[in-house]
Amino acid sequence: RQLDQRPFETVEQMDTYMIEQWNRVVKKNRDEVYILGDFCIGKGDQTNEVLSMLRGKKYLITGNHDQRFLRDKQFDASLFQWIKSYAEIHDNNRKVVLSHYPIICYHGQYLGDISYMLYGHVHDTMDYKNVRRFVQESRQCVYGSEQKSLSCNLINCFAGFSDFAPCTLDQWIKMEEEYS
């Protein structure tokens, strides 16, 4: 409850709300959802139960809080399409780098608005403020006498920013632009 000032009295209340939000957005089992880590701090059987209630094809980028269920023999890894610590995918001709942790020098960052780095981990904390400061300063770099803008498209996909619902890349981009 204290982390991120989440509005839930209990973990069960939070889980119920997050599952409802997920299934409100993810309508079909062919919809793909990339989870950027810290999916569950529970045991394997608890994680299996939650995953079985969620629609769509699920992909996991591992986070620091996922190790408990990942190491549990009861965990059914087949509930995810894949489990990786890092991935690069494409979405409508845009390169998307996926990591639990923000990567300030990511593959493809000089490609402009066709390359994005999506991350989690930092929630809405001082670490996030530091990443935002880096992005803003990178976009206003000065090389010699000319001002040159780097397209530093790091997007914090903290679930609290989206009311705990999965979002499309376009939705995350719009939220990031509105926040800037």
Regions found by a protein language model. Give the residues of each.
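Extended recognition/assembly regions associated with phosphoester-bond processing machinery
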Residues: 1-36, 40-180
